[in-house]
UniProtKB/Swiss-Prot annotation:
Expressed by the venom gland. Contains 3 disulfide bonds. It comes from Ethmostigmus rubripes. It comes from the Eukaryota. Transmembrane segments: none annotated. Residues 39-97 form the Chitin-binding type-2 domain. Keywords: Chitin-binding, Disulfide bond, Secreted, Signal, Toxin. Its main location: secreted. Disulfide bonds join 74-87. GO terms for cellular component: extracellular region. Pfam families: CBM_14. This is U-scoloptoxin(01)-Er1a. Belongs to the scoloptoxin-01 family. It is found in: Secreted.
Length: 119
């Protein structure tokens, strides 16, 4: 009987551990300050905004037309939506798509529209 109790206890502990792990994986990133180890460079990149997949898209970067880097942090519970170029709920954007979405999203970021008016 004691063996049955031990087996049941071990199974309950294992199920609890699995539940806790799943719960942690489903939580959105909740950074409240810029993390250590942000490593991004604008060299070789077109001007625009880039989600940092290394930080689950909660960190994002802007490369200016001059190649200057500025790094930003989305608020707790949000990530950078590379398609819309805004911080958004994680349910609205899959961070794994950021690299493939970057070129199209940044295509017109720093372009100026010229207006032609006729006299």
């Amino acid at each position: 009987m004691e063996i049955h109790s031990n087996i049941i206890l071990l199974l309950l502990i294992a199920l609890f551990a699995i539940f806790v792990k799943m719960e942690d994986e489903e939580k959105p990133p909740n950074l409240t300050r810029m993390p250590e180890g942000v490593n991004f460079a604008c060299s070789g990149k077109k001007p625009g905004f880039y989600a940092d997949e290394g930080f689950d898209c909660q960190v994002y970067h802007m490369c200016s037309p001059e190649g200057q880097l500025t790094t930003y942090l989305c608020g707790p519970g949000t990530i950078f939506n590379q398609k819309k170029l805004v911080c958004d709920l994680p349910t609205n954007y899959n961070c794994a798509d950021a690299a493939k979405d970057a070129e199209e999203a940044n295509a017109n970021v720093f372009k100026t529209q010229s207006s032609t008016s006729e006299p």
